[in-house]
């Protein structure tokens, strides 16, 4: 997929991600994928930006705060394992709080979750979906002239 930029951040650097998102031109499509504590912090990112097209939160952890989503997100999918014993006592068992979150449960161990083909296919389909939508370069840089008034 052309013109797709991928940047990786460690979970404690979520505020740097916010800064980078806020520097993007209006209309740039943003997909945030967070795993474990990064999944939890995807909510903090959404709450500190104007808009995110899509978030995929993979197995958020119960070992940190569970901040409610208040930011604007077009689509938010959370994949988690409700059985804490399969995720090292809850590292992938947190159910995030917020409107319009699509919850998907799985039986993956915490370390095995990123290798799940359903997760990987979801990531690919979201990238393809957002890549197919017009970006900021599709918007005219100068507004069109007004129509002449009828006489």
Write out the residue ranges for each language-model feature.
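Active-site catalytic motif of lipid deacylating hydrolases and related acyltransferases
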Residues: 1-28, 108-113
């Amino acid at each position: 997929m052309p013109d797709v930029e991928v940047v990786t951040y460690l979970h404690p650097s979520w505020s740097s991600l916010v800064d980078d998102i806020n520097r993007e031109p209006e209309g740039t499509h943003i997909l945030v994928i967070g795993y474990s504590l990064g999944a939890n912090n995807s909510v903090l990112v959404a709450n500190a930006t104007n808009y995110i097209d899509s978030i995929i939160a993979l197995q958020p952890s119960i070992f940190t705060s569970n901040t409610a989503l208040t930011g604007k997100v077009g689509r938010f999918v959370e994949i988690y394992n409700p059985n804490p014993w399969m995720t090292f006592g809850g590292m992938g068992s947190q159910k995030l709080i917020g409107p319009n979150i699509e919850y998907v449960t799985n039986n993956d161990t915490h370390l095995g979750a990123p290798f799940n083909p359903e997760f990987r296919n979801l990531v690919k389909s979201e990238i393809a979906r957002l890549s197919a939508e017009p970006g900021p370069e599709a918007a005219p840089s100068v507004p069109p002239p007004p129509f002449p008034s009828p006489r």
